[in-house]
Amino acid sequence: MSILESVHGPRDLDRLTERELDQLAAEVRAFLVANVAKTGGHLGPNLGVVETTIAIHRVFDSPRDAIVFDTGHQSYVHKLLTGRQDFSRLRQKGGLAGYPQRSESEHDIVESSHASSSLSWADGISRAFEMTGQDDRHVVAVVGDGALTGGMTWEALNNISDDNNRRLIIVVNDNGRSYAPTIGGMARFLNTVRTRRSYRSLYLTSRKAFEKLGGPGQSLYRGIRGGLHGFLSRFSDNEALYSNLDIKYIGPVHGHDIGAMEEALRQAKNYGAPVIVHAITQKGRGYEPALRDIADQFHAVGQIDPETGDPIGSPAKPNWTGVFAEEIVALAEENPKLVGITAAMLRPTGLHRFAERFPDRVYDVGIAEQHAVTSAAGLAFGGLHPVVAIYATFMNRAFDQVLMDVALHKAGVTFVLDRAGVTGPDGPSHHGIWDLAILQVVPGIRLAAPRDATRFREELAEAVAVADAPTVLRFPKGSVPADIEAVRRRDDGVDVLHESDQKDVLLVTVGPMAGLGLRVAEALAAQGIGATVVDPRWVVPVPRSVLDLAAGHRIVVTMEDGIRVGGIGTRVRQDLREAGIDTAVDELGLPDEFIDHATRDEILDDAGLTPQKIARDLVAQVLGSRVPIARPLPVEEFTEPSPERKKRRA
C-alpha cells in the first residue's frame, strides 16, 4: 500500500516521518498527473500546492479549523488528504467536483471558485468564532498572488487589520501567476520579494553550507530551517507591504519545503492574531511538460498523454474563442480606435492574439472586473472603442459598473462574454446562465447571441460600430457548429431559419439554441404541426418583427440556454403584452437553481431541453391535451382535435 492510500483523513498525516512526507508529496504529484490526464482539470495549480497543503493539514485541525481556498481550483490535494481519492469521474456527473463542494465533505467550508473572495470569508468566519466564544478555532485562507490583484482582497485586509484578536492565518501562494504571469504593481512587488538577492542568496548560501557537512549538517538544517526563513525574511525587510496594515508577516517561505512551511504555520498559529505567511511556490512543480508550458503551465488541461503532456483524441475543432481571437484582430486592423481589455485572462478569452499584434492597444487589469468595466467607460469617453473580453460568469461581478458607468453615460463599450450558458464540468460557479437575465434590464443595452461563426463576425462588426450604448455578444464554451443559413432575413435583421404554411408554433431561438429549434420543428412536422423558427440575432431589444410573427401564430416558444426567470422569454412575453398581442408564450430555459457539474448535453437533457421532450410537450399543447401558457385554446379545440388536425396527424 502506498502512503497516499493509507491517508483517509488529515490526522493520518500526523504519524508520518519527514521522509514519508516527502514520499507522500511525490505520490500525490504522480496521482494527479495520472488521473487528471484522463479526465482533464486544473493540473498546474495543484502540482504547485502539494507541500503547502500537506503542511496546512498537519498544523491545523480541519474541519474544526476552517480552511478556505481562494479560487478553489487548487483544492485537489486538499480533497486527497481528506479522504476523497476516487478521481475517476473528476468534474463528471456524479463524480468529484473540480472545486470545494460542501455536499462532498465537511472539510469543504466554502464552495469557492471566483477569485479574491477568500479573505472576506475568512474575515466573517473568524469574527463569528470570536463573537461566539470559539477562540480556539483558527481560520486559514489560502490565496494566490493573482487574487491579490482583486479589490475584495484589499477591502478584506482593511477590516482584518482593524481587529488583532482573531486567529486568522493568510497563506499567500505566490507562484507569480494566475492563469498566466500575474500583472500589475502588486505582482512587481511580490516578484521583488521572490527574487531579492538579500533573501535568496543568503538562503541558498546558508543551505549549501549545511549540506556540505553531510548527513549531520542536513539534519541540523532541517531542524532550524523555519528559524532561518524567519531570520532572513526580517533581514531582507520584506514586511514593508503589510506593515501599515498592522498584520504580522512571516516569509517568504519555501512553499515546497514541508518542514519550513510547518514551522512558519506553527509560528502563525501561536501568534493569536492575523498573520500572513508568504509561500513561494512553482506552478506545475515536478511535471516537466507543465514547466515547459510558458503560456500557463498547464493551468487547465483536457485529456492528455501523461508522459508527454500532449493532448489526446481527435484534433480540436474550431472553437468560439478562436473565432473571436481572429475576428477582433481583423477588425482592429481596420479600426485603430479598437482596444482590448481583460481581467487576468488574456489567453483564455482569446485576446492574446490581439496583444501579439497590437501590444499597445490591450490592457490586462488583473482579477478586477469592476475596474475593467469602468476603465472601459473612460476609454470610450476618450474617443476609443473598448472591447471587454470576459467569461460570462465573471460579468456578474461588475453589474453596477455596466449599469452606472457605461449605460448611464451612453458609453460605446462592447462586452464579449465567453463561456455563456451551460459550461459543463466546472460546475455551478462557472455556468454563464445569469447574464441574459441580469443584463437585459440595463437601459439602452443591445445584446446579441450568434448562432454560428458567420453570424458572430457580423454581430461583432455591428457591435463595435455602436458608439453611444453598451453592446454585448455572448457565446458558449466549445466548438462552433456548422453555419445555419437563413431562409430569409427580415428588414430588422431577424433571420427566419425555417417556415411552414401552417402557423402553429413560432420558435424563437437564442444563439446556439438555433440547431435545437430546427430539430424541434422537424419533430413537430412529423406530427402534422407547422412551425416557424427564427433567430433574432440581436435579442435585446426584442426586434419588432418577432412580435409581428408572434401575432400570426398560436403559440410562441422561446428557447435559451440561460435561466428562464427574467430571461429573454420573459422579455418577449412582456413586449407582446404591451403590444396588445395575446399569443400564448412558453418560455424554455434553465431552472433558477445552481446546476452541478456535468456535460452540456446532460444538463440540457435534465432541463428538458431536447428535441423529443420539447416536441412532445408542444404536441400536447397544440393538439389539445395540455392548455398552453397565457392563452387557453377554445374548449372545443383542447377537448377534441378538429377534423383537419385529425387528418394531418393521420
Curated annotation (Swiss-Prot):
Organism: Leifsonia xyli subsp. xyli (strain CTCB07)
GO cellular component, one term: cytosol
Binding of Mg(2+), residues: D145, N175
GO biological process: 1-deoxy-D-xylulose 5-phosphate biosynthetic process; isopentenyl diphosphate biosynthetic process, methylerythritol 4-phosphate pathway; terpenoid biosynthetic process; thiamine biosynthetic process
Name of the protein in question: 1-deoxy-D-xylulose-5-phosphate synthase
Similarity annotation: Belongs to the transketolase family. DXPS subfamily.
Function: Catalyzes the acyloin condensation reaction between C atoms 2 and 3 of pyruvate and glyceraldehyde 3-phosphate to yield 1-deoxy-D-xylulose-5-phosphate (DXP).
Catalytic activity: D-glyceraldehyde 3-phosphate + pyruvate + H(+) = 1-deoxy-D-xylulose 5-phosphate + CO2
Assembly notes: Homodimer.
